[in-house]
Every structure is written in structure tokens, then in C-alpha cells.
Amino acid sequence: MTDRTPSAAPRRRFLKNATAGAVGTAALAAPMVSTAQTVSFRFQSTWPAKDIFHEYANDFAKKINDMAGNRLKIEVLPAGSVVPAFQLLDAVSKGTLDGGHGVVAYHYGKNSALALWGSGPGFGMDPNMLLAWHYYGGGEALLQEIYRSINIDVVSFLYGPMPTQPFGWFKKPIARVDDIKGMKFRTVGLAVDMYTDMGAAVNPLPGGEIVPALDRGLIDGAEFNNASSDRLLGFPDVVKNCMLQSFHQSTEQFEILFNRAKYNALPADLKKTIDYAVEAASADMSWKAVDRNSKDYEELKKAGVNFYKTPDAILRAQLAAWDKIIEKKGTENPLFKKVIDAQRAFARRAGAWQNDYLVDFKMAYNHYFARR
């Protein structure tokens, strides 16, 4: 977000001034709002129209539209409406689209360091902690530096920490590390390198192409993201085995993009409205995910899907693969190493705090619901 500082004082001043303005100058402000020209932005998401992720994109747009009154309107088109999902960044940078909704890992082909916002080792961080690193630990400046290095002219807002993603959907459960060798598997971002190192033949398909590829036998297994998206995209219609828990993309979040020139042309108060709408959407998305994912998890089990915990041996093998990949990529790409070093330093401090302070909620759940 723009002009982020650890202090909450600017936010309080903004809210105080906004409230005072609404109460004290309503008579003057109303005519200005009603006669002001509406700025309309056309966005595209990287998600199919039926995916809950596209719903999240529309949720953000609605917050902007509501908060800005009639002064700023955002319309969000589904993936492929203007450009393919993996071409969103270029389309926004060039002004073909005014903005977009996706994930940073989809830009992996531009610079491998971009995949580290979600698809990477994480160093024990969860998605919420990675967002803390991004906004308070230097990540935002690093992302801007990478975009400048590849001549991408966008304003980027990260938001919406995603729940831990499953290992994936398979025709039969994956019991051993050796089961991954030779498997045709779908994933994206730096996880492509991780699974390739583990012996898989990886195909980084966009979300809308995964289930048809599984159905036709073009791939043996695939991951997308969560119970709600996987159910809506039709995974349980073609395979019935889902492996839960993985380190392949354990720190992912969404990205909202604006074309920089069009964003810069907005007045300061609308830029600030966008800033706070992103934060509101981030909280709302994380709450909705808990509700919807848990409901869809139950529905998937009712539909005959078999869920298995990914064996610890596979999780350890993932971490070992990450060790090799970050060493190799860090040597090849100075920006990659710069991001890795910054994440590791933040994770060492914040992870120690979280691991020591947070109670074992699973213990309480098992106590109350007799789950052994």
C-alpha cells in the first residue's frame, strides 16, 4: 500500500477527518459528489467466474464502490475476458486493463523472486505473517524494486492471507516420496521448481484448465488452493483423493494491481479510500474463507472425497527441496537472495514469538469435540 508506516496515527487522523467532514460539511459536500464525474476502472481477475477467488475480487470492488460513492467505480471481469490469466501483469502495466486481481506467484516467469510472495520456503511463516513482513518488514519496497527492474509500471496492494493449501488431488493417495517421481502434476510459481526437484513432471496450468486436464488424463494430480475453490472448479467430479497440508505454497495472499498512471491521476482522498478498502477486504476475505472453506470441506466429505494428511516424510522432503532451490536461485538472482534474506530475518524473530505465544488450539478442539 502507499506510504505505509508502523504508526496507526495517520489512520486515526484520516478517520477523524473523514467523520468530521461528513458531519460538518454535508450540505457543501453533497452537491460536489452528485455532480462529480465518475471514474470507471476496468479490472480483470485471474480466476474463473465461478471461483470463490473471483467472488473475492468482486467483494473488493464493491467495497471501493460503496466507500467512494459515485466517484470511483470498479468492474471486475473473469479470467480470459481481455487477456489470459498469466498475462494480467503486462496488461495492467501497459494500460490495456486499468487493474487486476490475482497472485504475485503468477508473475514467476518475469523474475523468480516474485514467486517468494506465496510460493517459497516461508521459513515457518504463515500467510498472515508474510503480509506482516511485506508491510512492516521491508517486503513492499522489495516488490516495488523487482517491478521496476522488469519495467512493470503498476501500483500493487497485497491482501487476503490464504489458508494453508492442500498438497493436491490425486487418483490414488500419495504415501511415499518416491510416489512423486514421474508423476504429471499441476502447480505454479516456485513450486514448479520444488516438485521438479522431487521428480515430478510439472505443468503450470491456469485454474480453469486444471480439472479438464485431470479428466482427460493429461496430468496425474493437481493442486489449486482450498476446499471452496476446488469444489466449485469440479475437482471431486474427476478424482476422490485429496492430500491435506503442504509446504509448496504455504504463505500465499492475493494481489490487487492498478495501472500506475491511472492510479496517480486519482485525487489523494480516493487513493486513501483504496488503501483502506484493501485492508477492509483483507479482513473480510479471511473471515469469509473460514466460513466457506469449512462448509465446503464438510460437503466434499459428504460427496465421497477421501481426505488424507500428507505424510511427514513428504513434508520434510519439500523443505529439503526448498533448501536446494533457494541456494541455487539466490546465486543466480541477486534480487531473489535479497528477498530470501529479508524474509528469513523477519521469520526468525516473528516466528519465535508466534510459536512461543500461541496456544495449541488443536488440544482445545479435541477436548470439546472428542476428536482423537
Region annotations inferred by a language model:
Residues T2, S7-L28, T35-L130, E145-R372:
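N-terminal secretory/targeting leader peptides
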